[in-house]
């Protein structure tokens, strides 16, 4: 399966880069992985609701421009559906069985995703009702994708 992760923002922390690189290496035996980093829009403090929407729309247009037309799109969204690791593994397996060879995960910037991006998503996935830094979510997502492949292949992985 081809998996792309479209993310707004760059990774600055070395410890996150190391973890991300480790899971990219581990995933290379299971899938073709592409991480597409997009520049985030500069957002000053104390934005109005309208200014937030403008920034999300600008980032959203960049995101939409990177989604392949045939991809099944999973947007990470706080209001999405929460899944266990086993349920994510089953979802990914079911998508492959149904002929989806391209899966695209989307991680928005600090303000979240635009309505247009959420509208394009085939599925909204929530890892928690809590908010996490989007850089950290990249590492957590990669770990969960790796765990899903291990589960689907009947391979041991710590719980």
Curated annotation (Swiss-Prot):
In the UniProt record, which is one GO cellular component term?
cytoplasm
EC code: 2.1.1.177
**Which keywords are on file for this protein?**
Cytoplasm, Methyltransferase, rRNA processing, S-adenosyl-L-methionine, Transferase
Q: Where does S-adenosyl-L-methionine bind?
A: 76, 108, 127-132
The keyword Cytoplasm is assigned to this record: yes
- Could you tell me what reaction this enzyme catalyses? pseudouridine(1915) in 23S rRNA + S-adenosyl-L-methionine = N(3)-methylpseudouridine(1915) in 23S rRNA + S-adenosyl-L-homocysteine + H(+)
Q: Name one GO molecular function term.
A: rRNA (pseudouridine-N3-)-methyltransferase activity
Q: Which domain of life is it from?
A: Bacteria
State the compartments where it is located: Cytoplasm
Residue ranges the record marks as coiled coil:
none
**UniProt KW Chaperone keyword:** no
Q: Which Pfam families match?
A: SPOUT_MTase
Q: Which family, according to the similarity comment? A: Belongs to the RNA methyltransferase RlmH family.
Please explain the role this protein plays, according to its UniProt record.
Specifically methylates the pseudouridine at position 1915 (m3Psi1915) in 23S rRNA.
Subunit description? Homodimer.
Q: Which NCBIfam families match?
A: PRK00103.1-3 (NF000985), tRNA_RlmH_YbeA (TIGR00246)
The record's listing under PANTHER family reads: METHYLTRANSFERASE, RIBOSOMAL RNA LARGE SUBUNIT METHYLTRANSFERASE H
Q: What is this protein called?
A: Ribosomal RNA large subunit methyltransferase H
State the organism's lineage: Bacteria, Bacillati, Bacillota, Clostridia, Peptostreptococcales
């Amino acid at each position: 399966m081809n998996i792309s992760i479209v993310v707004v923002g760059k990774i600055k922390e070395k410890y996150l880069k190391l973890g991300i690189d480790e899971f990219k290496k581990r995933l290379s035996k299971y899938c073709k992985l592409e991480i597409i980093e997009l520049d985030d829009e500069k957002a000053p403090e104390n934005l109005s609701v309208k200014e937030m929407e403008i920034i999300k729309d600008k980032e959203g247009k960049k995101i939409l421009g990177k989604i392949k037309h045939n991809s099944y799109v999973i947007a990470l969204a706080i209001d999405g559906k929460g899944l266990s690791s086993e349920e994510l593994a089953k979802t990914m397996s079911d998508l492959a069985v149904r002929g989806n060879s391209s899966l695209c995960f989307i991680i928005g910037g600090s303000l979240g995703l635009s309505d247009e991006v959420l509208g394009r998503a085939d599925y909204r996935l929530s890892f928690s009702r809590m908010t996490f830094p989007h850089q950290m979510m990249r590492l957590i997502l990669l770990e969960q994708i790796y765990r899903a492949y291990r589960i689907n292949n009947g391979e041991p992985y710590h719980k």
